[in-house]
Amino acid sequence: MSELSAAPLRPGKTQESEKGIYYAREGCVS
């Protein structure tokens, strides 16, 4: 469910795949 929340934050990165989700999370934390 967390992945869906991150999607709107970084749609461009989430489109990549699992890696996209990870990037979205790191971007928010960093």
UniProtKB/Swiss-Prot annotation:
* Protein name as annotated: Uncharacterized protein TP_0161
